[in-house]
């Protein structure tokens, strides 16, 4: 992310999404939510499967969706709120990416930046409006091909 910021000389709000995910919903509501909160934001969804929780970022939120804590791949998830890799960074928070890296955030793990950022400033987590499909291997790709029906607005 910092590479893109530097190379493209980005100086604006940013929408960052992992390329191995497909969504069945529009991102318009997410962007509107983030702009309404006037903070950086992520998405979250309720994950009931304990095994899947061990493989994702998990957030604890308050009644206003403010992130109180985020952990990546915790052996003891604190909640069932899983965070897929969909991030909206405000312009001011995008400028902190290098500081986050310097503080130990992984350059190939954007969730670690959110975990760090929510301790520096307010970050919110919007409940996902639909389903996401994670394409991690050929089997999941084939499953998505058979199930995916496109974006619902």
Predicted regions and their residues:
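Conserved beta-loop-beta/alpha segment of the NTase-like Rossmann-fold superfamily
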Residues: 1-62
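Catalytic-core segments of class I nucleotidyltransferases/pyrophosphorylases
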Residues: 22, 31-35, 66-134, 138-153
């Amino acid at each position: 992310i910092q590479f893109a910021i530097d190379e493209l000389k980005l100086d604006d709000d940013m929408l960052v999404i992992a390329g191995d995910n497909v969504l069945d919903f529009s991102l318009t509501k997410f962007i509107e939510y983030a702009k309404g909160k006037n903070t950086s934001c992520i998405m979250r969804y309720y994950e009931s499967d304990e095994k899947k929780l061990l493989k994702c970022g998990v957030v604890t939120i308050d009644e206003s969706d403010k992130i109180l804590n985020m952990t990546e791949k915790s052996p003891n998830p604190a909640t069932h709120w899983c965070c897929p890799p969909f991030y909206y960074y405000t312009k001011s928070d995008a400028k902190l990416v290098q500081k986050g890296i310097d503080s130990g955030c992984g350059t190939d793990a954007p969730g670690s930046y959110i975990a760090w950022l929510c301790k520096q400033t307010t970050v919110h987590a919007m409940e996902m409006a639909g389903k996401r499909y994670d394409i991690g291997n050929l089997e999941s790709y084939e499953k998505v091909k058979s199930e995916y029906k496109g974006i619902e607005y």
